[in-house]
């Protein structure tokens, strides 16, 4: 399976079937009684497409006292399709379509590069490292989502390479994080292990496509959406599930 399994109708991209999984029985992650769980990848084009939707949802959750978490999915951890004319043309069509549907900006300078390794693991790892460093901030979820969105923008609009650690210098500065501390942690085995644990959690949840949103009701996971969606429809679905829980 390749990155070309992006569905313009549903607004989602699927991960390879060989994704890692956790042992049976590890069905839920720690969190509050009610938590909205966003599963995505900074280098998933449809995840960038719904960036404004996620920002609105994060604000809604904060106002309602609902937990909000990000879990990295590893769309193409380890690398993707060969960087040839066919794949670059696929990306051009896909990004053009997503821009038209969602209004999100895309730059196309990256598609002029002769060589590029579409490995999404480093970008996912960067978000995990940032979240660990942001742990002293409140609210952590909003700060992590802002970092995630900044990585997306720098990749999709500015066309820079998230595998290069210097890619994150300005993003760390904007987030008031020490870039030198980030750089040191980013290169560690512990950081790689942490991001692969998140990939494995996605597999255990049965998440195979991004973006996906789950509502965790004290360990009872309800899928809200898989693919492009709107904040209004998601909020309606959340409130319906919460009302049903009260009844």
Segments and roles (model prediction):
Residues 51-155:
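Structural alpha/beta surface segment adjacent to cysteine/selenocysteine redox centers
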Residues 28-56, 67, 71-74:
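Local sequence-structure signature of Cys/Sec-based thiol-disulfide redox active-site neighborhoods
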Residues 2-16, 20, 39, 43, ...:
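C-terminal cap of thioredoxin/glutaredoxin-like
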Residues 47, 116, 224:
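Active-site-adjacent beta-strand anchor residues
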Residues 31, 121, 207-208:
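A generic fold-level signal
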Residues 14-34:
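A short beta-strand-turn-helix
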Residues 24-29, 78-85, 167-172:
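Short low-complexity stretches enriched in small and charged residues
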């Amino acid at each position: 399976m390749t990155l070309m399994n992006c569905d313009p109708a549903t607004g989602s991209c699927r991960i390879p079937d060989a994704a890692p999984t956790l042992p049976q029985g590890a069905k839920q992650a720690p969190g509050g009684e009610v938590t909205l769980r966003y599963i995505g990848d900074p280098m998933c084009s449809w995840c960038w497409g719904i960036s404004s939707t996620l920002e609105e949802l994060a604000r809604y959750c904060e106002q309602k006292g609902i937990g909000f978490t990000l879990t990295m999915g590893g769309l193409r951890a380890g690398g993707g399709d060969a960087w040839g004319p066919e794949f670059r043309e696929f990306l051009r069509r896909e990004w053009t379509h997503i821009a038209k549907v969602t209004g999100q900006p895309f730059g196309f300078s990256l598609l002029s590069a002769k060589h590029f390794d579409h490995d999404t693991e480093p970008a996912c790892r960067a978000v995990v490292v940032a979240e660990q460093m942001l742990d002293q901030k409140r609210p952590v979820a909003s700060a992590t989502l802002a970092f995630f969105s900044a990585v997306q923008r720098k990749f999709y609009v500015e066309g820079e390479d998230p595998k290069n650690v210097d890619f994150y210098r300005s993003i760390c500065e904007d987030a008031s994080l020490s870039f030198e501390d980030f750089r040191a942690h980013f290169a560690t085995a512990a950081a790689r292990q942490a991001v692969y644990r998140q990939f494995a959690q996605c597999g255990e949840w049965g998440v195979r496509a991004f973006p996906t949103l789950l509502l965790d009701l004290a360990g009872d996971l309800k899928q809200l959406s898989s693919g492009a969606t709107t904040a209004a429809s998601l909020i309606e679905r959340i409130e319906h599930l919460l009302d049903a829980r009260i009844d």
